[in-house]
Amino acid sequence: MQARRTRLALSALAAAALAAACGGGSGGDMGSSGTATSSSAASSKTVLPDVFALEPRLSREPMNDIMTGELLPIIDRLFDLVRAQGLDTELQGVKVFAPNSGDKFLPGKVAIGFSYLLLNSSPSDPKYQTYLDGYRAIADMTIDVVNETWGIYYYTSALWKLKKAGYLDGPTPAVNPATLELLKTKLDWRIFVDEANNYALKNGLPTNYYGVAFSIARLRYLLGWEDASGSEALLQKMINHYKTFSAYGFSDETDGSGRFDRYSILLIGEIWQRLIETDMQVSAEDEALLKGWLRQSVDVIKLRLNPAGNGVDYGRSLSAYADTAFCEVLSAAEHMNVLTDEEKEVAYAFATRVAAKYVEFWYDSDWGSLNMWEKGRRTDSYRGKARILGENLSLSHQLLYTNNLWKASGFAQKKPMATPQFVQYLQALPSSTLTKFAGFDGQGATYDRGLVTYRDGLRVISLPVVNGAATYHRTNPYFAIPHSYNMLSGVADTQWPQLQPRFTFANTGTPQVLIPASYQKNLQTQASADGRQLQVTWQQDALDRVAGTGSGSQPFKDTRITSSTRFDFEPGQITRVDTYTPSGAQAISKVELEFGSFSSDVTALGGNRFSYASGDVTGFEIEGLQDCTVADVSADTNYNTPGGALKTSIRCSSPAFSFEQPLTIKWVLKYRSGSIASFKPN
């Protein structure tokens, strides 16, 4: 209790610092893809001491100092490990180069990660010769290790950086000529792109791989390995996909199904980073399009900025990548002069926080490694612990190369803006915004895809209304529910019914299960004049069948139940009301809903009402379901989020019934208004 009182008390130091702060900012025009309400400052005029206590310790230092003082030494230790153990390298119990490791990108990530040791040293450095000889030996050693797609890009990027720095020339190059000749054949985008079939992606790869293929083709051209035709064709393929499947400037990760997530915000940043990296010139028309899309991503990111360096909070492939995605977009936007001068300062301050969070939270000093997999953390199965070395190096690469852009713009030794000034800018951002991704044309067959952002002071809450599409539509990181760092979260690859009901039919055979996902339309928002209250509504003309006959990887439209949904956001409280209507009598065996929370010490108050004594959530109540129980889930890996373990779950259900009349399910979630998400769970 004492710690909580301390967090919720205004410190004299914080008040004095704020009084002295200057500057600030405005949310500004959100562009055609979004509608914004008035400033979030309306809900929080003061800053709690949380801001100073819960931001990363190093976030007030120059980003480049974090790179040289913290990150490069981490890479150096990993380099020594690989150099000493070779293909038998073991990190945290993982034989990283084992044939069955599952890391299909590792040689490329090794090449790019360890290249920074050479690129940041000189012949006078005591370890220079060790780096040079070790890099050459590792390149020889990994030549036959599986390396696909992203790994091919990372390797070609590393070679181009080394070539520009002169490390591929002379009597003792960083890569042996014979090995380089083999790499020329192995590092080819045609391995995963069907050039003869209009440059179609092979094996069902998601559309962000167009950017990967383009990057490889362009780098091969710069290395003198092929002509420019491949990169030019792939660039146009990528731009055309954007034009076709991004009506509001964000890339659908599928061909029109409506999966808008971290990649949708990031992809335009990746495209610009590859253009910058390879000095690729595009037509004036394409440049205007690309800059416009980049600005759209910047506008979404601005709404989500926070003191802790936390990034995207819903969808797949989060963990540390959720944070670095913002760094990649913002550094590209700064380089291309898409940001105002004030925005550049704010973006740099946030990027520094991301870097500080990485070395203070994601990096586990006891492990000597990044940790995205244990101690309460969990990520998508395809980013399993078998990829531990590669994930260390690719994330380090993202921080290092974006830092290089900041250095090139004069930020090398610059401290970020002071915390009070940064916070003042954040408090002037809009309280709520609807960012449109797709739909909104009023057509009966169209489903709306968008992202609602609600800011309660410095607390950022997301409401994604998207389609997880193939594989992900039934997993709760894509549910249309609130997400907020260290308060409300889904869990990678899990399907338990977080904050939305799951209907199980009483049919024979495999029970059919429906959830309210994938088919939202008429998405609308309405905010109060002061921006403190926000109402969000939509309807569904069908639910998504996620189990039983007809279900599968793709969403399955089941019209036996339709629904209408209303969310009400206000400081300290979120309310959801759903009305489900059957098309005739339906035999239901059960309806279930859960609320998995970081809060604990739960007290049942009766009538399906609960209070919490510890954590940012203070209360939860539900109507429309009969029975609720409380479970301790702190040791259950199915409740491990990217950042840490959920502690409790309130599990509600109703027994079998004949579903003939509309059913209303309502829940109210109360939380500490003005609470601030730390860079790590409390």
Regions found by a protein language model. Name each.
Residues 178-432:
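Extracellular polysaccharide-recognition and catalytic grooves
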Residues 9-46:
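Bacterial Sec-dependent N-terminal signal peptides
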Residues 128-204:
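Well-ordered mid-protein domain cores that form the structural environment of catalytic cofactors
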Residues 1-10:
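Bacterial N-terminal signal peptides that target proteins for export
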Residues 623-682:
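Beta-strand-rich recognition/accessory modules
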Residues 307, 311, 315, 324-642:
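Extended polysaccharide-engagement surfaces of secreted carbohydrate-active enzymes
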Residues 42-129:
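Low-complexity, Ser/Thr/Pro/Gly-enriched N-terminal "stalk/linker" regions
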Residues 98-120, 145-165, 206-223, 259-265, ...:
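An alpha-helical repeat/solenoid feature that recognizes helix-turn-helix modules
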